[in-house]
Amino acid sequence: MQITILGSGVIGVTTAYYLAKLGHEVTVIDREEGPAPETSFANAGQVSPGYASPWAAPGIPLKAAKWLFQKHAPLILRLTTDPVQYRWLLQMLANCTDSRYKINKTRMVRVAEYSRDCLIELRKDTGIEYDQRSQGTLQLFREQYQLDGIGKDIEVLRQDGVPFEVLDRDGCVNVEPALAHAKDKFVGGLRLPNDETGDCFKFTNALAKIAEGLGVKFRFGVNIKSLLMSGGKISGVETSEGIVTAERYVVALGSYTPALIKALGLNAPIYPVKGYSITAPIVDESRAPVSTVLDESYKIAITRLGDRIRVGGMAEVSGFTDDLPAARRATLDLSVTDLFPGGDLKAATFWSGLRPMTPDSTPIIGGTRYDNLFINAGHGTLGWTMACGSGRLLADLISGNKADIRADDLGIARYN
């Protein structure tokens, strides 16, 4: 089949790769000049299925109220005049119950675990390189109450068969030796040994080259204007270079997905939740991380990517903004200086990206009421973690193959 994919981030490119592997004729269209220059460009770098948890969780409304008054808060809410923002926030609040949390987390872990397995298989098949490490991730707790409160998460990990280790200070230093100088800054940690790390931007660009070798065509610098409809199905894509036609269409435009499909009567409550990162060259190996360390107090991930340290995190609900406030940079600097001062922060690059978040934190993967239109978007903070699994799952659904995991509860129908 001829299939057109809209979007060349990590989700769009992985989808293209898996469709091409199944023998389809694939074209990818994007307004940018190459793969992954936006949200996939400088994320935290972790592939962490075990930490796949909804932002909408019991207790979050109270925590969010407290964070409003903290200088280095992990969540920043900047209200706009856009009614879409308010509707999304209300939908998110509706998911902050025990029952919804369990449903949403189960779905997220299902996709994330499958995706990690797909990534490992892809790596074996292609030999792709992207500063990858398979040395687990460590969630670090600065306060005793944080360590005492992980019982619910451990229960879910145990039920899902995810290996884990609860570590004291010495145990944390054993897996991340550079923490020896900061033992007074934390009380313990939760380690997931099967998690991985890697540079999402490098991966996406390398996979795009591999996909080209399978026949995928990339059309960069092309603006997508609208989807055209005829006879109850999609008949083409109106672009700045004319109308593009295919037999099947995939929308993988992240936070920009809702605007494109709204005219078709489809509701995808995906809202941009802004994240920040800095990337610094390592100048002191003895004070740099081995893998990824999650600073629970600030919700920041500190990751080793080759000869660089990537520090990323926070969640800012402020609409489609791309500014780089000094206050956000200060929070990233504070966390990494406290724990891993082995990077040259003066030489660091500062970045922000718009994570496409659904109110239930679960991505939208699957078909629509239009037989030839599919969605792969809304992965929030876990786009890198879920990319390979999402791409392979959708490729199977489009091809009519039996999916490896349950997919009926991942589609847009849950909102329409």
From Swiss-Prot:
InterPro entries: DadA (IPR023080), FAD-dep_OxRdtase (IPR006076), FAD/NAD-bd_sf (IPR036188). Keywords: FAD, Flavoprotein, Oxidoreductase. One of its GO terms (biological process) is D-alanine catabolic process. It is an enzyme of class 1 (oxidoreductase). One of its GO terms (cellular component) is cytoplasm. FAD binds at residues 3-17. Pfam families: DAO. It catalyses: a D-alpha-amino acid + A + H2O = a 2-oxocarboxylate + AH2 + NH4(+). Its EC number is 1.4.99.-. Its cofactor is FAD. The keyword rRNA processing does not apply. GO terms for molecular function: D-amino-acid dehydrogenase activity. It comes from the Bacteria. Belongs to the DadA oxidoreductase family. Oxidative deamination of D-amino acids. This is D-amino acid dehydrogenase.
